[in-house]
Design a protein with these regions (language model features):
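Hydrophobic residues within alpha-helices
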Residues: 58-62, 136, 176, 224
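Short, polar loop motifs at secondary-structure junctions
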Residues: 75-82, 195
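Active-site-lining helix/loop region of Rossmann-like oxidoreductase modules
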Residues: 198-257
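NAD(P)H-binding glycine-rich loop region in Rossmannoid oxidoreductase-like domains
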Residues: 81-142, 229
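Conserved Rossmann-fold NAD(P)-dependent oxidoreductase catalytic core, especially the SDR/UDP-sugar
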Residues: 72, 79-80, 120-183, 189
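Short, Lys/Arg-enriched N-terminal segments with co-localized hydrophobic residues
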Residues: 27-46
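N-terminal Rossmann NAD(P)H-binding glycine-rich loop of SDR-like oxidoreductase domains
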Residues: 49-69
Length: 257
């Protein structure tokens, strides 16, 4: 038996009867390795996130996905009578307010990350889609909330690629995206999907494609949720559309920048 035990453990010593008397250190190391995995899992499960834009199609799906992933979710909205079920706290976040007010609304929430998925659907592009995003980015930085995930639109940061149909919308998104990239030190990820469609989730996507394509809304939400702790996506812009690669694999396969 001592030979069998010491074939897998190091630093074993034997007494005169051939019994192991010094396996405490290796056993401790094995135990500690397991404990670190558990602590890491707990940190992931209990990460607290704010989603701004929960009334939209992507926002609703994102909240569901984050809750399913075990996140503690704060739904930021001016419509605080909404009910998202267990695991979600609804708090007032007014993107039309000034920056100081936003900081005051954010501070007591004590979140670890912020998602910006808000949009005015063309009704208030400057105040919501552009300046609302910028104020939230600045508020996050002022409070030391480093992780910021932005839902943008296809090639919003590349004006030469824009068509005429959504030019005003793209201008607003360009302003919000470039401010995040150029004027903050946040650990941001900007996700730029192509057209959104009301189709069921497939869990299969293409990340960083060169041509636009359709995106099932639940797929976009699932990618956003998966980005949360994907450090290889920090400080980068990622395009996407539906594809044939499972989301976890697609994230792992992203080329280094």
């Amino acid at each position: 038996m001592p030979v069998t035990v010491c074939s897998v453990l190091t630093n074993c010593k034997f007494n005169s009867r051939g019994r192991v008397i010094n396996i405490i250190q290796p056993l401790f190391l094995l135990w500690w390795g397991k404990m670190k995995d558990i602590v890491s899992d707990e940190k992931e499960i209990h990460m607290k996130v704010l989603v701004v834009g929960v009334s939209g199609r992507v926002g609703e799906e994102l909240v569901k996905q984050l809750v399913a992933d075990g996140r503690e979710v704060v739904a930021g909205t001016r419509h605080t009578d909404q009910d998202f079920g267990a695991g979600v706290t609804v708090k007032n976040i007014d993107l039309l307010a000034d920056e100081a007010t936003l900081i005051g609304e954010l501070r007591p929430l004590a979140v670890d990350a912020i998602y910006f998925v808000a949009g005015s659907r063309g009704k208030n592009l400057l105040q919501i889609d552009a300046f609302g995003a910028v104020k939230l980015e600045n508020a996050a930085e002022a409070l030391g909330i480093k992780r910021f995930i932005m839902l943008s639109s296809w090639n919003a940061t590349s004006p030469a690629e824009w068509g005429e149909g959504l030019r005003d919308y793209n201008i607003a998104k360009f302003f919000a995206d470039r401010w995040l990239m150029d004027n903050t030190k946040l650990d941001y990820t900007i996700l730029q999907p192509g057209s959104l469609v009301e189709e069921p989730a497939t869990g299969l996507v293409a990340l960083d494609p060169t041509e636009p394509g359709k995106n099932a809304i639940p797929n976009v939400a699932a990618v956003l949720a998966a980005l949360l702790q994907a450090e290889n996506t920090y400080r980068r812009v990622i395009t996407m559309h539906d594809g044939d690669v499972a989301i976890p694999d697609a994230l792992r396969e992203l080329k280094s920048i």
